[in-house]
Amino acid sequence: SAAIDAGADSVSLVRSDAAAAVGAGLDLDAPEAKLVVDVGAGKISATLFTFGRVAAFGYLPYGLGRIDERVQRSIQMNYGYRIGRSSAREIKHTLGTALPGAAASDVLMHMTGFSIADRIPKVFDVETKSVLEACEDVVREIVGLVASVVDNAPEELSADLTDMGIVLTGTGAELTGLNK
């Protein structure tokens, strides 16, 4: 392998969720259960570790990139503008939230997009509620994934989660309110 050719003594494969947990400072060899939810752009996984082993695991074959796609569709349907993936990601990071009540305090964001009606680029305002709709389903599925992993774990490990909580990793962990 390339690592051996480069002078490494040995090469080990490590689960990405385990690497994220160790990077977050968790001791996976300890008896207390730790739940790590890795929220990436391409996939979302939830892994319950104890004694250095996986006690329960689940994943969604998509990540928060799905929100980007939904933001693009929402902007086109509700505002009549086409935007690119990077603009949708910027809107998600600025206005996106996992908190359902956030639409009550609506925030506007100026964005440039291609006006479908006028066939030219224009600046328009995006409201929080448009992005909230794009986030809701994916957030609900993340909550369902976590519940499923906890439900499938041995009962004695559930008590540890009350003390230890859940560790969120990945770029999607920055979605406002996801840690609630």
Where are these regions (language model features)?
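Nucleotide/phosphate-binding catalytic cleft detector across ATP-hydrolyzing
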Residues: 1-41, 47-166, 173-180
